[in-house]
């Protein structure tokens, strides 16, 4: 199994069990998330509750919770939304921090294509949810989520160059 860690913080953000599609010349990865239900285990013990006069589960408090699989698996932490000025400030700092961590070939490609990806994200800014890794480090990479027109499950966007592949 491959795990993808944030190159800036070491937080685990994704794994190969979630297929991705490269967009914007490979700068962004698009990953489909899914809402899943946690808890609410229905255990059949073979009894016949209607014959025993128990129409309800007495003393059972299942606490079923709906969560997004990617957010839950990698313990992503949601952040307040950014306005345009905050986002541009974040991107400048992110580019400054990430660029020296890339090899020369990747630096060239990153510098050439990050502007288009930034414009794409700015065009969706009001629809985005913002997440960071478990450490909630200020200098970490952001993970973005949005809902495509009519979709019930979120689509996540990752900065591909900010991910380090680690074999588990």
Swiss-Prot record:
Keyword Acetylation: no
Subcellular location: Cytoplasm
TCTP domain residues: 1-168
Annotated GO MF terms: calcium ion binding
Keywords attached to this entry: Calcium, Cytoplasm
GO CC list: cytoplasm
Domain of life: Eukaryota
InterPro entries: Mss4-like_sf, Mss4/transl-control_tumour, TCTP, Translation_control_tumour_CS, Translational_control_tumour_p
General function of this protein: Involved in calcium binding and microtubule stabilization.
Homology family: Belongs to the TCTP family.
Name of the protein: Translationally-controlled tumor protein homolog
Organism this protein belongs to: Hevea brasiliensis
Gene, per the UniProt record: TCTP
């Amino acid at each position: 199994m491959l795990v993808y860690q944030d190159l800036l913080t070491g937080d685990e953000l994704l794994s190969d069990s979630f297929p991705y599609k490269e967009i914007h010349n490979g700068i962004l990865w698009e990953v489909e998330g899914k809402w899943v239900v946690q808890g609410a285990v229905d255990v059949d013990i073979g009894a016949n509750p209607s014959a025993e006069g128990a129409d309800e589960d007495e003393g059972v408090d299942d606490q079923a919770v709906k969560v997004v699989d990617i957010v839950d698996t990698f313990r992503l932490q949601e952040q307040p939304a950014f306005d345009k000025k905050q986002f541009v400030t974040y991107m400048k700092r992110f580019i400054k921090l990430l660029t020296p961590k890339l090899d020369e070939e990747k630096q060239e490609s990153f510098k050439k294509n990050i502007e288009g990806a930034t414009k794409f994200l700015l065009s969706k800014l009001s629809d985005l949810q913002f997440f960071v890794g478990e450490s909630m480090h200020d200098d970490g990479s952001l993970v973005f989520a949005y809902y495509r027109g009519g979709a019930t499950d979120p689509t996540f966007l990752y900065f591909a160059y900010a991910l380090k592949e680690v074999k588990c």
